[in-house]
């Protein structure tokens, strides 16, 4: 009886609690969440800076956008002093009609208030990208800013706030929290570097921060592509003897007219040296891939031949890009090879892709061969004994079904002998797998992949070995 009373009391308490939740007033239900005191203090500090800028320049002040990169928020919380606490807030403003309209303002939390503790400024209408990194080995992190001057024109700047005088509380003497008067001259960071750079057509930045010479210091690699195809190159800058200095340049492949994509990765070997994988567009629409690294004490393009043109050219088939195809964290470079065609397939091109990898000694090594079906989202690792033995065709005549047929090549005058079909069907058509005697490769959301061995040729694979070789194409390979 006592237990029943306890249970009844608990039920009553829960009912009363739920009543309090479910029968709140409409005003309470639709009320915006309360903002933290720190958020309000920061916004008040930003408003004061905007007001001071408007008074100083007699011009309108608005927010400035950040186009690309990992830091695109309008207000960015950062740990600039490297103590593990994000004590700084960075915001981006634009003042209309002045020489350097873009203003990047740094605030530091001092007690419960936010004080403005630094500013950098630049030309253009937008901040293309910004990064924060220790460049000069002391003080606060530097700001590495790519200013978008106009469409297709960019300036890369490196700025330090270390020359600003901070009080014991971490604030400058340029402004007090209760004042709208700001001496901006006391807030300006020092410009360590200002140079032009390219931006890739996929949106990736034409500059990369990395310890490219592996001396434990961060360097800045800047890519510049000449649209005339004559003089494209990479230049590396680093902090030496109290200043930013050019540490070396290296030419990129002749004939490139547009930067397509930049990836920072490694060369094979231990330790893995950093390398830039630079994909550019040629005047004829093909792609050239340059691999740039620090080798034997200097900046080197590992892919250039004696004529100054990259050995890694994608011509005719450009749907693949450098990819970590074998999962060892080092990018491989694709080389497409056109397969022979027969009959109705003469108008359709099918390719096998050889993947190679550059190591820390600059040597090029073959890793694997694949067939990539980009439209259907899968690829097949090709066994070595298939090389020079196969052709590929496609059959999309059945509604809701796509079939890729692998056949043994018997020569130009003989019809190829099919030995394997790989199917992509919708999940709603899953009954076709058993009805047709196929075997399942795998099932994804709304899609089933299946296969069937055909003919008499022993291709050297069983069902499980084929499953292990058919893999999904990761979209990040193409868009990261």
Predicted regions, residues:
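Generic N-terminal leader/processing signal
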Residues: 1-2, 107
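Sec-dependent N-terminal signal peptides of Gram-positive bacterial secreted proteins and lipoproteins
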Residues: 2-26
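Beta-propeller-forming repeat regions
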Residues: 21-394, 398, 403-404, 429-432, ...
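A short acidic-to-branched-hydrophobic micro-motif
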Residues: 408-429
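Domain-scale activation on soluble regions of proteins
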Residues: 444-463
């Amino acid at each position: 009886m006592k237990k029943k009373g306890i249970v009844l009391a608990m039920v009553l308490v829960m009912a009363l609690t739920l009543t309090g939740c479910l029968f709140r007033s409409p005003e309470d239900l639709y009320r915006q969440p309360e903002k933290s005191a720190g958020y309000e203090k920061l916004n008040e500090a930003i408003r004061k800076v905007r007001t001071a800028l408007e008074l100083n320049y007699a011009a309108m002040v608005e927010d400035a956008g950040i186009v690309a990169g990992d830091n695109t928020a309008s207000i960015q919380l950062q740990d600039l002093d490297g103590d593990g606490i994000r004590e700084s807030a960075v915001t981006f403003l634009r003042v209309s009609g002045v020489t350097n309209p873009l203003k990047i303002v740094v605030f530091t939390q001092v007690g419960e208030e936010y004080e403005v503790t630094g500013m950098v400024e630049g030309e253009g209408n937008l901040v293309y990208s910004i990064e924060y990194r220790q460049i000069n080995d002391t003080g606060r992190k530097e700001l590495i800013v790519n200013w978008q001057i106009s469409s297709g024109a960019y300036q890369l700047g490196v700025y330090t706030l270390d020359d600003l005088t901070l009080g014991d509380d971490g604030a400058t003497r340029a402004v007090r929290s209760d004042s709208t008067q700001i001496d901006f001259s006391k807030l300006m960071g020092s410009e360590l570097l200002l140079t032009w750079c390219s931006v890739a057509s996929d949106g990736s930045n034409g500059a990369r921060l990395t310890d490219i010479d592996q001396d434990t210091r961060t360097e800045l690699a800047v890519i510049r592509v000449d649209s005339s195809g004559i003089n494209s190159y990479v230049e590396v800058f680093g902090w030496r003897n109290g200043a930013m200095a050019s540490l070396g340049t290296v030419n990129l492949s002749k004939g490139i007219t547009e930067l397509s994509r930049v990836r920072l990765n490694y060369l094979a070997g231990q330790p893995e040296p950093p390398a830039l994988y630079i994909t550019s567009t040629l005047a004829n629409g093909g792609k050239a891939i340059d691999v740039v690294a620090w080798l034997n004490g200097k900046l080197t393009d590992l892919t250039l031949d004696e004529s100054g043109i990259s050995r890694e050219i994608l011509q005719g088939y450009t749907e693949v890009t450098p990819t970590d195809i074998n999962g060892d964290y080092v990018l491989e470079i694709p080389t497409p090879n056109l397969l022979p065609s027969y009959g109705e397939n003469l108008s359709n091109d099918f390719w096998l892709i050889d993947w190679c990898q550059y190591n820390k000694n600059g040597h090029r090594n073959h890793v694997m061969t694949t067939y990539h079906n980009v439209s259907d989202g899968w690829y097949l690792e090709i066994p070595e004994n298939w090389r020079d033995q196969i052709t590929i065709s496609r059959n999309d005549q059945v509604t809701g079904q796509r079939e890729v047929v692998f056949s043994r090549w018997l020569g130009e005058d003989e019809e190829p002998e099919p030995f394997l079909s790989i199917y992509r069907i919708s999940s709603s058509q899953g009954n076709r797998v058993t009805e047709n005697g196929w075997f399942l490769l795998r099932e994804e959301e709304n899609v089933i992949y299946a296969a069937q061995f055909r003919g008499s040729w022993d291709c050297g694979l069983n069902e499980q070995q084929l499953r292990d070789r058919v893999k999904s194409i990761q979209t990040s390979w193409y868009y990261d």
